């Protein structure tokens, strides 16, 4: 029996998490208000407040594993990164082989931010393909709107309904959702967990990019290689208590310390006004040579703060959101766009296709997670021309029906 999801890959969380906007077609969903609580309901420090130590989140074994995975060879076609995986233990799914179209039940944490919206659009276009091919009859979806209790009720509703041939679960948080995931497993139907993890190994597969430590290593090494000992980095963080975000900072902080970089971090709630205020205050006390972010929300505001102050632009890491890529090109700053591979939203449905065919799949399906470099930026800008600022460059849906219009128009089901 493989180890628990938590111990093998710690917890995977979304890149841009936990704004409280409900499922809606309102265009304002692109810029939801900042969350007031963390993933498990803990109070979030006031925006602009420095964080406490990240030591409790640092795990050397997981750090080393994800560092190694950054250079791993992935099985599968690089043109289909959403199907690639690192070679490892496989799950025999022959017991789940089925004839005819099957019903999927999807319990989603939310679509409350642009990263999740982009993935949700892609997932629905992938669903259309599998419906047309007769693999899936329908996907009944319940959106928890970033609330643990709602998602627990959603999963229990699916179980009581007794009409699901398979479960797909993107957990809102780790510990709180574990019992509900286990109850879904007890139905005897295949369960797929993706994006963020839970503390059980009962799922047929856990799908996620490499992880938070890999993000932290990519970004902190990039900044450290370009800065000198004693240079100052301002780290902008969305909120505390979300494992993958904490892991990003835990890895980055360790690397900054090793390289003598003076790094100070603040929680921002992804509020552009607060981000500008933090940076303005830091610039008023001295030079800032680098900006590090645990997610790209507010990256443009950070750059604009330097422009408003007439200060030299920093070395900076953002994310593969189009707003950052465009501002990066416009300003010519020295930057890197780390990713939390948005194309992962296709993988659960493609995994179901394999499961219903009785094919083996990875027990832990680790997807590629490669940042966008300056040399690659132009390629991704061209490929995503016409996409809205909230779109994510590595969304992986170019071969799906509706491309590019569905994503350009942000047609959120």
Where do the protein language model's features map onto the residues?
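Sec-dependent bacterial lipoprotein signal peptides
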Residues: 1-21
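A residue-level marker of the well-folded mature domains of exported/periplasmic proteins
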Residues: 2-5, 22-413
